[in-house]
Amino acid sequence: MVVKIGILKCGNIGMSPVVDLCLDERADRNDIDVRVLGSGAKMNPDQVEEVAKKMVEEVKPDFIVYIGPNPAAPGPKKAREILSAGGIPAVIIGDAPGIKDKDAMAEEGLGYVLIKCDPMIGARRQFLDPVEMAMFNADVIRVLAGTGALRVVQNAIDDMVFAVEEGKEIPLPKIVITEQKAVEAMDFANPYAKAKAMAAFVMAEKVADIDVKGCFMTKEMEKYIPIVASAHETIRYAAKLVDEARELEKATDAVSRKPHAGAGQILNKCKLMEKPE
């Protein structure tokens, strides 16, 4: 059986570029077929409505994953409205601002995965250009991967896939990813590696607070430019911490790897030269 997954990308968070790729990291999985629709960097209600309706009415997947910033904003709320009424199981993946709407999403019959370490970018024209944007997102992706947050998201979607394959009711995740949930998913062998990953997670959370201050709460240019710049420096060092954590695991040949089999099962290995089972 091939499970058809629909992914809606409206706006961008750090998890957005890899949410589909983490389900099929070698492009050889034969049990899923993924379709991605998106509205680019913007997530205004009209744009979101267009792609959400197309997903529900034309693509008609087995389930839908919506991903983007702030699920409580007007555009994402429009998507939630369409998905809630669409008759297709759906999950919302978002960042920390969505936590205040998690109960509302559950009442709408939607699942959610809210990632506390996926921070807002420093979106000030005097600071943010395409290069800075790409480097920030690269650092965030490194934090998501190295702390275990990415693995939590991947596991939640895989559980939905496995339910479809087994003919069971699709479980709609209701997850807020904290530093504890993230590092548990990574199976760290070295407690210092785990501690470094936890520190990186908390630093990434703080980046969001700094960028909110720089983007929305500070009006003077000479003040908000160094504020958002400091947020980007913070995520850069958080990414360095997850590198350090992984190097500690490498030193004892204990890196947790969980690749997908061709048929979709999640395999497991820790030693570099052993086969996954």
UniProtKB/Swiss-Prot annotation:
Looking up InterPro entries in the UniProt record yields:
MTD, MTD_sf
Give GO BP annotations, semicolon-separated: methanogenesis, from carbon dioxide; one-carbon metabolic process
Biological or metabolic pathway of the protein: One-carbon metabolism; methanogenesis from CO(2); 5,10-methylene-5,6,7,8-tetrahydromethanopterin from 5,10-methenyl-5,6,7,8-tetrahydromethanopterin (coenzyme F420 route): step 1/1
> Is Ribonucleoprotein tagged as a keyword?
no
Task: State its Enzyme Commission number(s).
Answer: 1.5.98.1
Keywords of the record: Methanogenesis, One-carbon metabolism, Oxidoreductase
Which Pfam families does the entry link to?
MTD
**Molecular function (GO) terms listed?**
ferredoxin hydrogenase activity; methylenetetrahydromethanopterin dehydrogenase activity
Is Oxidoreductase one of the keywords? Answer: yes
Which reactions is this enzyme annotated as catalysing? Answer: 5,10-methylenetetrahydromethanopterin + oxidized coenzyme F420-(gamma-L-Glu)(n) + 2 H(+) = 5,10-methenyl-5,6,7,8-tetrahydromethanopterin + reduced coenzyme F420-(gamma-L-Glu)(n)
Q: What is known about what this protein does?
A: Catalyzes the reversible reduction of methenyl-H(4)MPT(+) to methylene-H(4)MPT.
Homology family: Belongs to the MTD family.
Question: Matching HAMAP family, A to Z?
Answer: MTD
Protein name (Swiss-Prot/TrEMBL):
F420-dependent methylenetetrahydromethanopterin dehydrogenase
